[in-house]
């Protein structure tokens, strides 16, 4: 009986040690995954219903697909704007959206870019872009078939393209 009790105590102690010594890794999605889902969903909702872009009605158009190369181009541009403290479609070295997309491996034929700064959520930046005629028209352009986006320190970038 004493030997059985010692065995139980031994396994309980070992079990407790293992339980308390193992660290669980946090189960969170990366911001990129969250952004890709919510941004693509918001843009496609807009494209599904059509909308007013300034004084021009933009009719419904086909949904976009997510493109990892355009996402990388958006990430690169957001990082560049943040690290070099500028806000423009053309970098201080003269790089334009199509060049950034090609550098990221994008092989499509058409690239349009929206940028935003100091917005705190996808909803906020989407509202701002929808209220700007040129940004709204970029999101509604029927030539676009794919998109990628990124945010870094409140620098938002959308890249649209045609594959």
Regions found by a protein language model. Give the residues of each.
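Short, surface-exposed glycine/acidic/tryptophan-bearing loops
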Residues: 69-121
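A short alpha-helix/helix-coil micro-patch that ends at or immediately precedes a cysteine
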Residues: 28-83
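Bacterial signal peptide processing site
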Residues: 23-26
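C-terminal motif of bacterial Sec signal peptides marking the signal peptidase cleavage site
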Residues: 18-21
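Bacterial N-terminal signal peptides that target proteins for export
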Residues: 1-10
